[in-house]
Swiss-Prot record:
Family recorded in the similarity comment: Belongs to the rhamnose mutarotase family.
Keywords: Carbohydrate metabolism, Cytoplasm, Isomerase, Rhamnose metabolism
GO molecular function terms noted in the UniProt entry: L-rhamnose mutarotase activity; racemase and epimerase activity, acting on carbohydrates and derivatives
Species in which this protein is naturally found: Bacillus subtilis (strain 168)
EC number: 5.1.3.32
Reaction equations catalysed: alpha-L-rhamnose = beta-L-rhamnose
GO terms classed as biological process: rhamnose catabolic process
Protein name: L-rhamnose mutarotase
Length: 104
């Protein structure tokens, strides 16, 4: 498994809605994430800044990249766009983080 982490940004007046949408994640979205090799996916919120810290483990980088091309992912991004900073394709603005320490 490969560990991945990134920072995303949620609008400060949208925290509750962001959390609720993830509490009620579409079953087909959860299935697609798993089918594309996602495990142990967690998102944490810094309420002072609106920064989201996302962590997940993936089986394979290429398999994971294909998730972005799925119809359900495209719909999810579009539905989440009003809540977050996004790119022109509605994908979340995300900063990939470099792992500098790991203790098993």
């Amino acid at each position: 498994m490969k560990r991945k982490a990134s920072i995303m940004f949620v609008h400060q007046d949208k925290y509750e809605e962001y959390k609720q949408r993830h509490d009620d994640i579409w079953p087909e979205m959860a299935e697609a994430l798993k089918a594309h090799g996602a495990h142990h996916y967690s998102i944490f919120l810094d309420e002072e800044t609106g920064r989201l810290f996302a962590y997940l483990e993936i089986e394979d980088e290429e398999k994971w990249r294909k998730m972005a091309d799925t119809e359900v992912c495209q719909r999810w991004w579009k539905s989440m766009a009003p809540l977050m900073k996004t790119n022109s394709d509605f994908s979340p603005v995300a900063i990939d983080l470099k792992e500098v320490f790991y203790l098993d």
